Amino acid sequence: MEFRLKQLRDAVAADAAGRVQEVRYFLDEIEKRADEMCKAERLYREGKLPKRVCHCDTKVNNMMFDEDGTVLCVIDLDTVMPSFIFSDYGDFLRSGANTGLEDDKNLDNVNFNMEIFQAFTKGYLESGKSFLLPIEIENLPYAAALFPYMQCVRFLADYINGDTYYKIQYP
């Protein structure tokens, strides 16, 4: 998260597309939460949180299903790297528990499905009980908030830079 915040701060400093003032409110909201959202890196530096082999792009689109809807495997393995379990847990919830599309024009469609959150968390904890550390389990709610926050930081940095990575279709 620290890396993504640095990218955003660099984008703000450069203001390449002249958009910083129009998004000042959002920048202030991001900065209010920055310290909290960098918790994983702090815990890692303190020796309290391990890095593990993670997929790092565990959205629903990167899962292959059979005709009955059963998950067969995870695809898009070029993103596998050492990271925190929060990466896979939080990123899946960002996409899987979202009731709308990532680029949904109608924000009334966008919500967080608590039933999916609860079912996924139950399955995640059952599957990971043999290796997850207490600090990882305690911070799963943080992970659920981290990835929407991270995407917001990424989208906003790109917008400030002039839509260089994410091509927008509408304001």
How would you describe each model-predicted region?
Residues 124-144:
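Hydrophobic alpha-helical bundle architecture
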Residues 12-15, 150-171:
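ATP/Mg2+ or Mg2+-diphosphate-binding catalytic cores
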Residues 1, 143, 159:
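Short acidic/histidine-centered micro-motifs embedded in hydrophobic/aromatic stretches
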Residues 3, 84, 115-119, 135, ...:
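Generic recognition of stable, solvent-exposed alpha-helical segments in well-folded globular domains
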Residues 1-55, 60-68, 146, 167-168:
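ATP-dependent phospho-/nucleotidyl transfer catalytic cores
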Residues 107-111, 137-148:
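A short beta-alpha structural unit
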Residues 52, 66-125, 129, 167-170:
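Active-site Asp-x-Gly
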